[in-house]
Amino acid sequence: MKNREVIANLILLVVAIIWGGGFIAGKMALTTLNPVAVLMYRFALGALLCGIVFWNRIKKTPVSVIKKGVIIGMIQMVGLTVQLSGLQYTSTANQSFLCTAYVAFVPFISWIILRKRPENKAFVAGCLALVGIGLICLDRALSIGIGDSLSIMFSVIFGVQIVVVGLLVDSDIDVFQLSFFQLFTAAIISFCICLVQGNVINCFNTESAIGVLYLGILNTFVAFLGQNYAQKYTKDTVAALIMSLESVFGFLLSVLYYNEVITLKFL
């Protein structure tokens, strides 16, 4: 069981690296697409790949797993819509840090949902996270921009998703079945929103197409399968801590790709 936990944590580390690159991919996709359209293509591609590869298992999915996938997919859709909307108004470096503040929120969200009081060190971590958020976001007028505000909101929503996944997913559940209905639910919701907005078909350029492919194949199909599998064999707080490393990879990759300036407040 210990070896399985180590493997699960290594998988989550790979997920963090993939998600780190996802900040750049998201920015690329937004060059010609709006946030909901990006999510529609992303989740549709992820669900399609999952359905093709694991159809023999998916067609045997019990109703209980479908319900869990729908719940997680709805939370995921809301969170990522908020995240991409925020990315339109802030830098990838800013968002890569702010979106991973969920590592400090998870113990408190668990407290609310599971009635488990966090350890004292969780309160210290929460205070440090707030200080970091303040250094990154606050300007001289002590106000926070809309992009940074939405990024912080996403970190709270994703913290809820981590706790809910830990609550609903046990070691006996088929993660491929769960992931398909999670992605399928998010794809359907985003498609319906695009229908209302009149943005079902959008024009792509090379940059946005590469961004969508990265998000659909790696960030969605590969990473969410990895997350759902690994969280069966490790603790919620450990999972949150490892996945928060996406901020490090996201920041470093954004500095390399966009030549963003490293300032003292990030360090």
Where do the language-model regions lie?
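Transmembrane alpha-helical segments that form core, pore/gating elements
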Residues: I24, A47-C50, V106-F108, I112, ...
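Hydrophobic/aromatic residues within transmembrane alpha-helices
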Residues: A29, V38, R42, G86, ...
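Helix-helix packing/entry segments at the starts of transmembrane helices
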Residues: M40-Y41, T81, Q95-A101, V165-A187, ...
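C-terminal transmembrane-helix exit sites in multi-pass transporters
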Residues: L49-I58, Q83, Y102-V124, V248-F266
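Hydrophobic transmembrane alpha-helices of multi-pass small-molecule transport proteins
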Residues: C50, V70, P118-L138, F158, ...
